[in-house]
From Swiss-Prot:
<comment type="subunit">
    <text>Interacts with sulfhydryl oxidase OPG072; this interaction involves formation of a transient disulfide-bonded intermediate, allowing disulfide bond transfer. Interacts with OPG088; this interaction involves formation of a transient disulfide-bonded intermediate, allowing disulfide bond transfer.</text>
</comment>
<comment type="function">
    <text>Late protein which probably participates in disulfide bond formation by functioning as a thiol-disulfide transfer protein between membrane-associated OPG072 and OPG08. The complete pathway for formation of disulfide bonds in intracellular virion membrane proteins sequentially involves oxidation of OPG072, OPG128 and OPG08.</text>
</comment>
<protein>
    <recommendedName>
        <fullName>Protein OPG128</fullName>
    </recommendedName>
</protein>
<dbReference type="Pfam" id="PF05288">
    <property type="entry name" value="Pox_A3L"/>
</dbReference>
<comment type="similarity">
    <text>Belongs to the orthopoxvirus OPG128 family.</text>
</comment>
<keyword id="KW-1015">Disulfide bond</keyword>
<dbReference type="InterPro" id="IPR007952">
    <property type="entry name" value="Poxvirus_A2.5L"/>
</dbReference>
Length: 77
């Protein structure tokens, strides 16, 4: 028996954002990105920790959403 056989991981499938949702999010972030992003990240400490761990583990330095880069980098470092 391998050590990893005792683990059971269940992941929910990701939810897609409609084009309207995506447009609204982009508009909101471009208008007041810094304050909104900070509020979202700090209001969800568990998700912030998961994101931080993921970025540390994967050493992912590139995001598709360029508007998020500065704030996420500031919060996570």
């Amino acid at each position: 028996m391998s050590w990893y056989e005792k683990y059971n991981i269940v992941l929910n499938p990701p939810k897609r954002c409609s084009s309207t949702c995506s447009d609204n999010l982009t508009t909101i972030l471009s208008e007041d990105g810094t304050n909104i992003i900070r509020a979202i990240l700090y209001s969800q400490p568990k998700k912030l920790k998961i994101l931080q761990d993921f970025l540390t583990t994967s050493r992912n330095k590139m995001f598709l959403y360029k508007i998020l880069d500065d704030e996420i980098r500031r919060v996570l470092t």
